[in-house]
Regions:
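N-terminal helicase ATP-binding lobe
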Residues: 1-172
């Protein structure tokens, strides 16, 4: 006979909400090192001061790790139960780069399927949806309009200037 009480009473491991703690627990490849001081500073300030705020801008120089910062913020939101979350890139090429970056760091991302549907991991708040501007801002958006839409809790827009230019082009 199986005693299911032992199985059901197991303590569920708590997911980290603090993005710095979260990073230390990721199943990342051995080629990745610790967070850079700038990344830690931005993540700490976001977590301690700006976490509940909307419409934030993170501005850093090229190569300072904005992609990882954005992914950690979104993963933190998912761990908090605040999904679904979307990471938007200005084009497909950069989305592919971010996909491999996320995999390298052990952050679960999902992609819109070939038949333009949302993956269940995204809908259930278990993975970050990684996409690019043209998939979202077009005349046939799969995110929906009116009463038929996909709820999204948090969005990170990588390289916002380039994304905004692509959005303008889509509607002119």
């Amino acid at each position: 006979m199986i005693d299911f009480k032992k199985k059901l009473n197991r303590e569920v491991s708590k997911k980290h909400v603090n993005p710095i703690d979260l990073y230390s627990e990721l199943d990342r490849s051995s080629t990745t090192g610790p967070l850079r001081p700038t990344q830690e500073k931005v993540l700490r300030e976001w977590n301690d001061i700006h976490r509940g705020k909307r419409d934030l801008v993170v501005k850093l120089h090229t190569g300072e790790g904005k992609t990882l910062i954005g992914l950690l913020m979104l993963q933190s939101k998912l761990n908090e139960g605040e999904g679904p979350c979307v990471y938007i890139c200005p084009n497909k090429f950069l989305a592919d780069q971010v996909y491999y970056e996320a995999k390298k760091f052990g952050i679960k991302v999902s992609l819109i399927t070939e038949n333009n549907t949302f993956p269940n991991d995204f809908i259930d708040g278990n993975a970050i949806l990684l996409t690019y501007v043209q998939k979202i801002f077009n005349g046939k958006t799969i995110f929906g309009l009116d009463n038929q839409y996909q709820k999204v809790n948090t969005i990170v827009m990588d390289d916002a200037h380039a994304c905004l230019d692509a959005i303008k082009q889509a509607y002119t």
